[in-house]
C-alpha cells in the first residue's frame, strides 16, 4: 500500500511539473494524464502451463489549449529532453489545430476538492507460482465434473494500476487500484456433440474472490447442462436473461445515453430525456463512488467531481453521460463522466452502472411462463444504436411451465430496445461483479427465430 501511495504521489509531481513547464512555454491552458500498470497472468491447459505473461507500462499524455484550439500528445519517455520536446510539439500542434467552440477545461466550480478512499487495492500481489497453482486448481475442478471431457484451460491473474490527472486551473488528483482474476473454460461431450461453457471472477480484493475450485466447478457444470441442445420453433415468447447476459442490456442503454452519441444524433434515445423509457419502478444507477468498484474514482478525467446518479428513476430517463465538450454541445453541465487515454481528448463513459434489483426471485419471475426462453449466451453484435433494432444469436434453455428445461441453441432473438426496455422486469438477484451489472431480467414479447 505504501508503494501505491508513493507511485501516485510521484505521478502527481511529474505531471504538475510538466504543466508548469507547458504554461511557461506559452500554452494558455493545459491538462495532463498519467497511466501506469503492471500485471501478471498464468494460463494452463490440461495441467500444463500454456500462457505466462508479465507486463509493465507507463504512459503520459499532455493536452494543450490555445483559445478554442487543442492538441493531444503522449509519450513513454520521461527524460527531461523528451518532456521538453513533448511540450514544444503540443503547443505547435495546438496553434495549427482547427477551432472547436466546445473545447475547454471545466469551470473551476465543477472541480473535485475532496479525495475519497474507495478501497480499490488490498496490497496482495501473488507471484507466478501461486497464479499457476490457482489456474491449475480451477481447471482440475472443471475436469472433475462428470460429463466434462476436455478443457480450454484455466487462468489466474493480478494487476495494479495508477492514474493521475491534473490541469492548469488548480486540480490535481490520483488513484490506484488492483484486481485479481480466476477463470476456467470446460468442454463436455464428444465428437460432434460437444458443448463449452465458462466461469470468470474478478475482484479488487483477493479476499472477495471465490475459490478456484468453485469457479472451475461452475464452468464444468454449465458445460454439461448444455449437452444435446434442441432447436426451437420460431415464435414470440417471454425471454429471461441470465445475469451474465443481462448486463449487455444495461451496456446498450449506457451507450444510448452517451453524450457523444446524443450530440451526434446517433442514439435511439436522443429525444427521450425526461420521458418514460422503462416501466415504472425501474432504476438504473451510475455509482463512481462504490467501494471496491472496478470503475470507481472520485474525479473524472477533466477533474470534475463525481457523484452517484440515478440515470433512470421510476422508469424515466433523467440525464445523459456528459464530459465538458458534450455538455457544452447540449447546453448542459458536465456530469463527471469524462474518460481519457493519453493520446486523445476526453470523451464520456459510464462508471459502475447497474440495474437495481426487483422484488421477485428468478424462479418467481418465470413462474407464469408456459413456454419461453432462458438465455445464457449471446452471439454477435446485431444492435443498431441509431434505431434500437436488436437481433442476436443466442443459446440457453427452454422454459416450460415456469421451470428451466432442456438446452436450446442455434436461435436468434429479436426486438427493438425501445420496446424491450419498456417491457423489462428485473429479479432480485443483483450481484456486483463487473463495471456493468444486472440481475436476472425478463422481457415479454420478443421474437425467437429457430428452425
Locations of the language-model features?
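N-terminal small-residue-enriched
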Residues: 1-451
Amino acid at each position: 500500500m505504501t508503494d501505491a501511495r508513493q507511485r501516485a504521489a510521484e505521478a502527481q509531481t511529474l505531471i504538475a511539473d510538466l504543466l508548469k513547464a507547458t504554461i511557461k512555454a506559452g500554452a494558455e491552458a493545459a491538462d495532463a494524464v498519467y497511466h501506469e500498470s503492471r500485471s501478471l497472468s498464468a494460463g494452463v491447459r490440461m495441467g500444463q502451463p500454456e500462457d505466462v505473461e508479465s507486463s509493465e507500462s507507463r504512459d503520459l499524455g499532455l493536452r494543450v489549449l490555445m483559445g478554442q484550439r487543442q492538441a493531444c500528445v503522449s509519450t513513454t519517455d520521461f527524460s527531461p529532453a523528451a518532456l521538453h520536446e513533448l511540450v514544444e510539439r503540443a503547443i505547435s500542434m495546438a496553434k495549427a489545430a482547427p477551432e472547436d467552440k466546445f473545447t475547454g477545461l471545466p469551470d473551476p466550480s465543477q472541480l473535485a476538492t475532496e479525495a475519497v478512499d474507495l478501497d480499490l487495492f488490498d496490497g496482495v500481489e501473488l507471484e507466478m507460482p501461486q497464479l499457476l497453482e490457482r489456474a491449475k486448481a480451477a481447471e482440475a475442478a472443471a475436469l472433475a465434473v462428470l460429463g466434462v471431457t476436455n478443457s480450454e484451460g484455466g487462468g489466474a491473474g493480478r494487476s495494479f494500476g495508477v492514474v493521475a490527472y491534473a490541469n492548469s486551473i488548480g486540480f490535481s488528483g490520483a488513484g490506484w487500484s488492483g484486481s485479481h482474476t480466476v477463470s476456467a473454460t470446460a468442454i463436455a461431450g464428444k465428437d460432434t456433440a460437444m458443448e463449452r461453457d465458462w466461469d470468470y471472477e474478478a475482484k479488487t480484493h483477493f479476499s472477495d474472490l471465490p475459490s478456484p475450485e468453485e469457479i472451475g466447478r461452475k464452468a464444468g457444470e454449465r458445460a454439461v447442462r448444455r449437452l444435446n441442445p434442441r432447436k426451437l420453433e420460431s415464435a414470440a415468447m417471454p425471454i429471461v436473461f441470465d445475469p451474465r447476459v443481462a448486463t449487455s442490456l444495461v451496456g446498450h442503454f449506457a451507450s444510448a445515453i452517451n453524450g457523444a452519441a446524443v450530440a451526434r444524433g446517433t442514439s435511439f434515445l436522443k429525444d427521450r430525456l425526461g420521458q418514460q423509457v422503462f416501466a415504472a419502478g425501474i432504476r438504473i444507477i451510475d455509482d463512481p463512488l462504490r467501494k471496491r468498484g472496478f470503475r470507481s474514482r472520485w474525479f473524472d478525467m477533466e477533474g470534475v467531481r463525481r457523484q452517484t446518479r440515478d440515470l433512470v428513476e421510476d422508469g424515466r430517463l433523467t440525464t445523459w453521460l456528459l464530459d465538458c465538450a458534450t455538455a457544452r454541445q447540449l447546453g448542459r453541465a458536465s456530469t463527471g463522466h469524462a474518460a481519457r487515454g493519453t493520446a486523445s481528448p476526453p470523451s464520456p463513459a459510464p462508471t459502475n452502472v447497474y440495474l437495481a434489483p426487483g422484488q421477485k426471485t428468478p424462479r418467481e419471475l418465470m413462474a407464469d411462463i408456459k413456454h419461453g426462453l432462458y438465455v445464457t449466451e449471446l452471439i454477435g453484435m446485431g444492435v443498431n444504436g441509431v434505431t434500437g433494432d436488436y437481433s442476436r444469436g443466442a443459446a440457453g434453455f427452454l422454459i416450460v411451465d415456469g421451470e428451466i428445461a432442456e438446452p436450446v441453441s442455434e436461435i436468434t432473438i429479436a426486438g427493438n430496445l425501445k420496446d424491450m426496455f419498456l417491457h423489462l422486469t428485473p429479479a432480485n438477484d443483483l450481484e456486483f461483479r463487473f463495471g456493468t451489472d444486472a440481475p436476472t431480467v425478463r422481457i415479454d414479447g420478443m421474437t425467437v427465430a429457430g428452425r
